[in-house]
Amino acid sequence: MGIQGGSVLFGLLLVLAVFCHSGHSLQCYNCPNPTTDCKTAINCSSGFDTCLIARAGLQVYNQCWKFANCNYNDISTLLKESELRYFCCKKDLCNFNEQLESGGTSLSEKTVVLLVTPLLAAAWCLHP
């Protein structure tokens, strides 16, 4: 590669470095104590890839969470609540009260699509 090719490659790498940033951290509403109207937003720490909102009676928990732990057993154990509703999501500031009020579930829409698509594909392939 000549000098001109090296300059073009360097320019492309520079443009990619400027416009592509890695390490975007998810923003979630996070209140250390249960509250009914959490408005405190934080950038989640590394390893926390999901926002959680959980309601146990009148207590509402908003925080960063690990998607791998987004299930009833882990949430109820870590929050020390035996009866709760919860919603996990992976978009910035998606863990607000209306998610639970509108019938939020434990799985995001994308997760359901990712789970159902292979099953439909398998059924299609097996269909005579």
Swiss-Prot record:
Q: Which PROSITE patterns does the entry mention?
A: LY6_UPAR (PS00983)
> InterPro entries from the xrefs?
CD59 (IPR056949), CD59_antigen_CS (IPR018363), LY6_UPA_recep-like (IPR016054), Snake_toxin-like_sf (IPR045860)
Keyword Secreted among UniProt keywords: yes
Could you give one GO CC term from the UniProt record?
Answer: side of membrane
Topology relative to the membrane, per the entry? Lipid-anchor; GPI-anchor
Q: Where in the cell is it found?
A: Cell membrane; Secreted
Entry keywords, A to Z: Cell membrane, Disulfide bond, Glycoprotein, GPI-anchor, Lipoprotein, Membrane, Secreted, Signal
**Coiled coil located at which positions?**
none
Cysteine-cysteine disulfides = 28-51, 31-38, 44-64, 70-88, 89-94
User: What post-translational modification information does the record give?
Assistant: N- and O-glycosylated.
Q: Pro-sequence positions in this chain?
A: 103-128
Provide the glycosylation site positions.
43
Please report which positions carry a covalently bound lipid of kind GPI-anchor amidated serine. 102
The biological process GO terms on file are: negative regulation of activation of membrane attack complex
Residue ranges occupied by any UPAR/Ly6 domain in the UniProt entry = 26-108
Molecular function (GO) terms for this protein are:
complement binding
- Secretion signal: which residues? 1-25
Q: Which Pfam families match?
A: CD59
* Subunit note: Interacts with T-cell surface antigen CD2.
> Briefly, what is this protein's role?
Potent inhibitor of the complement membrane attack complex (MAC) action, which protects self-cells from damage during complement activation. Acts by binding to the beta-haipins of C8 (C8A and C8B) components of the assembling MAC, forming an intermolecular beta-sheet that prevents incorporation of the multiple copies of C9 required for complete formation of the osmolytic pore.
Q: What protein am I looking at?
A: CD59 glycoprotein
Please report the organism this UniProt entry assigns to the protein.
Macaca fascicularis
Q: What is the lineage of its organism?
A: Eukaryota, Metazoa, Chordata, Craniata, Vertebrata
